[in-house]
């Protein structure tokens, strides 16, 4: 039996088991409550209390699929497949389209779940770098050079995890051109679309810009509702049908309650309220992070993210990032993520998508810990 590649990032977070004093490792936003989602209207509350807790349809309810399709230009409900979070979406897509020996091209750094799935499927993994010395811009020439006839899928994350970088039009076009050249699929993780820091323009979905694009999203990041464990895949109808065949071996359906709630609060008027709240939270957190960096006297530096509630922070100390992470947690109860999880030592992924004072106090603990090491 081949050795199984565990998901190292999630494995480490599971060891903390939410016992940390300051959680700067989570990649989402301060979660919404049911009261915030439903409001104080007794009629609305009763409507949800009366939901029979039966199975949801395997394709999700028509109401949810229609609501989700309204978010994507040119999409219909047939292009939508609800799943149990973006993590299941990634797992299903790779298991549907790729076989041992196939090549997968990934922009990097990227959410490492896809890398782990690819390892377990025995795929040939090729990384195209976001360049550290160019504010995380994508090395688009490399994208064109690495694709071959064996390239079956190009996986991107836009906005990016862990850097918060948003692809430019030129970079998007380069990815599409590379995929078209070898007739490859594009898998676009778009879970941070809508969490923009520098402007109010929602990051444009790649869906519809090429006929072999599969996009995924979820409630967990921008929408600040990870506890409902709901995500969705947007793809050509024949593709969603193929993916459903695999889903029937995993979760079969999503949660009925999650389905009905999402169909309500993802209606455009409600959705925009959630996006406004998210942007308020992360912009305040980003200000705290930026001030902390400026006051760090060279101990830390960062290319400020354009979107998301996370930043990929460089530290100027002679200690491995995994050791930094572990020793920090043991010393002060602060959790953050080592750059090692993304294959880049010397960096830390730090969340700022929490209340300002919480983030500020957590960052102060990071500074106190770092001061004991020589630069």
Task: Label the model's feature ranges.
Residues 74, 144, 327-336, 342-375:
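PLP-dependent enzyme catalytic core of the Aspartate aminotransferase-like
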Residues 2-85, 92, 268, 373-375:
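N-terminal small-domain helix-loop-helix segment of the aminotransferase-like
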């Amino acid at each position: 039996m081949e050795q199984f590649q565990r998901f190292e990032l999630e494995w480490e977070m599971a060891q903390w088991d939410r016992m940390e004093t300051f959680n700067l490792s989570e990649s989402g936003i301060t979660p919404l409550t049911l009261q915030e989602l439903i409001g104080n209207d007794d009629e609305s509350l009763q409507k949800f209390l009366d939901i029979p807790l039966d199975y949801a349809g395997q394709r999700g309810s028509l109401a949810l699929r229609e609501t989700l399709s309204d978010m994507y230009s040119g999409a219909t409900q047939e292009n939508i497949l609800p799943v149990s979070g973006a993590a299941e979406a990634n797992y299903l897509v790779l298991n549907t389209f790729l076989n041992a020996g196939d090549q997968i091209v990934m922009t990097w750094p990227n959410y490492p779940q896809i890398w782990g799935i690819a390892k377990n499927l025995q795929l040939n993994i090729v990384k195209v770098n976001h360049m550290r010395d160019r504010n995380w811009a994508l090395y688009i020439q490399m994208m064109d050079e690495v694709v071959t006839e064996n390239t079956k899928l190009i996986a991107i994350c836009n906005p990016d995890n862990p850097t918060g970088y948003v692809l430019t039009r030129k970079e998007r076009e380069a990815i599409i051109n590379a995929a078209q050249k070898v007739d490859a699929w594009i898998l676009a993780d778009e879970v941070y679309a809508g969490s923009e820091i520098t402007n109010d323009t929602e990051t444009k979905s790649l869906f519809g810009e090429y006929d072999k694009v599969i996009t995924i999203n979820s409630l967990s990041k921008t929408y600040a509702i990870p506890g409902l464990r709901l995500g969705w895949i947007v793809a050509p109808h024949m593709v969603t049908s193929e993916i459903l065949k695999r889903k029937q071996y995993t979760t079969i359906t999503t949660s009925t309650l999650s389905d009905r709630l999402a169909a309500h609060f993802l209606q455009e008027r409600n959705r925009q309220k959630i996006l406004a709240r998210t942007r308020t939270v992360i912009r305040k957190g980003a200000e705290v992070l930026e001030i902390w960096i400026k006051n760090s006297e060279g101990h830390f530096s960062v290319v400020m993210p354009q979107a998301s509630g996370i930043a990929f922070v460089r530290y100027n100390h002679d200690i491995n990032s995994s050791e930094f992470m572990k020793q920090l947690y043991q010393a002060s109860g602060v959790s953050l993520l080592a750059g090692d999880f993304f294959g880049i030592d010397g960096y830390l992924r730090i969340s700022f998508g929490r209340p300002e004072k919480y983030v500020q106090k957590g960052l102060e603990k990071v500074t106190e810990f770092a001061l004991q090491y020589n630069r």
